[in-house]
Regions:
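Single conserved hydrophobic/aromatic residue that forms the stacking wall/gate
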Residues: 303-317
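N-terminal hydrophobic/helix-forming segments and targeting peptides
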Residues: 1-302
Length: 317
């Protein structure tokens, strides 16, 4: 049953992809393994027929492409996104203390259902920017263990809990990190060998530590956190790597910030894709008219999570 192997591969991919930065790192590793060359937006590109390349922006979006062996006259594009509904730590003011506990000061990120986040083992992953000699560098970080939780009130303190509750992120859902001293050694959880004053900024996201599973009488179902939209990122990458460019440039784009409108410099509504295609066009010796003609003949597919049927409430399908 080959589909079970693919399903497990997807679940393993999701468990490694704990933030948009980790998604792009995983995508880059997979592309490197398949003979792709990383390019830089700030440098001149030298492309060859049959070449395979990729470029990243903000370390959270990636565009990979294959140049056909012969001349091309269009682009074939598949797109998905690297971010997921979650909670993001407020980097400028990350802690809330009340004399007993240290909580993380978080904001809701994307279109989430809030209730499943309660009473689960959660952790943090993302990126920190640190001093590096006379400059700075970014470092991927992951606590890698059960670190925080968002506890529900017990039923005897909230008798209406089964009658429908409206949760406020700011008052009901700040994750407990530890006792009142926890903030003093927070950064050591991620970069134990880096002085606190050398950590200049951070972008940290909560993630669910519960592993996904394959279930059902015939193992026909799959459940996991971050399916939106990592199942699409995984599927588009696998399909892209299996395809061969013939007569068109094959493009696989995974954008960040779809969950919050795509308007950032690395979002789908940014210049990233357009400028990448213009780079390809120029490096292949084609003029502006040829670029617009090729673009007009492009084929684009956007992958995202959707609903075919609603198993819990069939009447709403």
């Amino acid at each position: 049953m080959e589909y079970l192997n693919t399903a497990q591969e997807l679940l393993d991919f999701i468990m490694r992809c704990k933030s948009p930065f980790h998604v792009v790192k995983e995508a880059g590793d997979l592309l490197n393994e398949n003979g792709y060359t990383k390019l830089e937006e700030t440098k001149e590109w030298s492309l060859v027929p049959g070449g395979k390349y990729y470029v990243t922006r903000n370390e959270s979006s990636v565009i990979a492409f294959q140049i056909p062996e012969s001349a091309f006259s269009s682009y074939q594009i598949i797109a998905s996104h690297s971010d997921c509904p979650t909670f993001k730590v407020k980097g400028e003011d990350p802690f809330v203390t009340d004399g007993h506990y240290t909580r993380l000061n978080v904001e809701g990120y994307g279109g989430m259902i809030r209730s499943p986040w309660f009473d689960r083992p959660l952790s943090l992953a993302g990126r920190m920017v640190v001093r590096d000699g006379n400059g700075v560098k970014s470092v991927l970080v992951d606590a890698g263990r059960d670190l925080v939780t968002i506890p529900n009130l017990p039923i005897h303190l909230n008798r209406d809990i089964n009658n429908g509750i409206k949760y406020s992120v700011q008052t009901d859902m700040l994750p407990i990190l530890g006792d009142e001293t926890a903030k003093d050694h927070f950064y050591e959880l991620f970069l134990p060998d880096t002085a606190k004053e050398d950590i200049l900024s951070m972008e940290l996201y909560l993630y669910n530590r519960v592993e996904g599973s394959i279930w059902g009488a015939s193992k026909e179902f799959l459940s996991s956190g971050r399916l939106d939209d990592l199942q699409s990122a995984f599927g588009s990458l696998k399909g892209f790597l299996a395809a061969k460019a013939t007569g068109q440039v094959n493009v696989c784009a995974i954008f960040d910030n779809e969950e919050v409108g795509s308007l950032t410099k690395q979002g789908a509504d940014s210049s990233f894709l357009t400028e990448t295609l213009q780079h390809i066009n120029a490096a292949c010796g084609k003029d502006t008219i040829a670029y617009h003609r090729d673009l007009a003949d492009r084929k684009s597919t956007r992958l995202n999570s959707s609903h075919l049927a609603r198993s819990r409430m069939p009447s709403s399908a």
